[in-house]
Amino acid sequence: MMNERLILVTNDDGYDSRGIAAAIEVARRFGRVVVVAPETTQSGMSQAITMNTPLFLRRVRSEEGLDVYAFSGTPVDCVKMAFDYLLRGKRVDLVLSGINHGSNSAVNVLYSGTMGAAIEGSFYGCPAVGLSLTDYSADADFDAAALYGERILRRLLEGGVQPPLCLNVNVPVGRPEELRGIRLCRQNRGFWREEFYRHEDPRGREYFWLTGDFVNQEPEAEDTDEWALAHGYVSVVPVQTCLLYTSPSP
């Protein structure tokens, strides 16, 4: 039965972000939802864990079919707290991480707290989805990400996929009717060329802001996530956790 499913929702933007509110509404269509998300923004934390400081958990919302917890740790800490404490001994049917406020395509998957949490969820033997919207603006429209996220979750939950499976899903900017569909892709081979901007505070101490530009090393490769997003498609990249090197295909 659909209402017997248990969905874990998390993110890296914080428990009170607009993206996770949209993700919760999507997840609630498939069953009971437990949210364990960071107390504060944890973007770029990848799979960092907290080892040398205590962690604090508080329940911020509870109603039929939904419990929301704020946790003082990283996104991966949140997943561990859910599986190893709050939901210990229970079967989790799917982990949804997001909806992230910004792209996690290409090499960003390695830096992303959103994807770090999704990958961690797959370690526990259930399907996991990292869902991101490629829009950083404060008034970002999450409708398309929610719509396509629901379609992908339905396929995972009802299609009999073999877990563990982790998907990196990125949704381009646009209304749902403007997008061209879903493309199964590989990760683009690109990188960030960073630059540090040096400044001084009023006390004369120097500080730095990190910025940079993404370098797409294969802009014409039509099988990559970057190409799909640039052409109005939702990109879906299956993510493996084994980092063993294999020769790239030509």
Model-predicted regions and their roles:
Residues L6, D93-L94:
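Structural motif
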Residues N3, I7, A21-Y85:
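A cross-family phosphate/adenosyl-ligand binding-site feature
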Residues Y245-P250:
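Conserved small/polar residues in nucleotide/adenosyl-binding loops
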Residues S122-A145:
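Glycine-rich phosphate/pyrophosphate-binding loops
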Residues L86-R91:
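Glycine-rich phosphate-binding loop signature in dinucleotide/nucleotide-binding domains
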Residues E200-E226:
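A conserved acidic, glycine/proline-rich C-terminal tail/linker
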Residues S103-S112:
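Glycine/threonine-rich flexible loop motifs
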Residues L133-Y136, A146, R155-P202:
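Active-site rim beta-loop-alpha module in soluble metabolic enzymes
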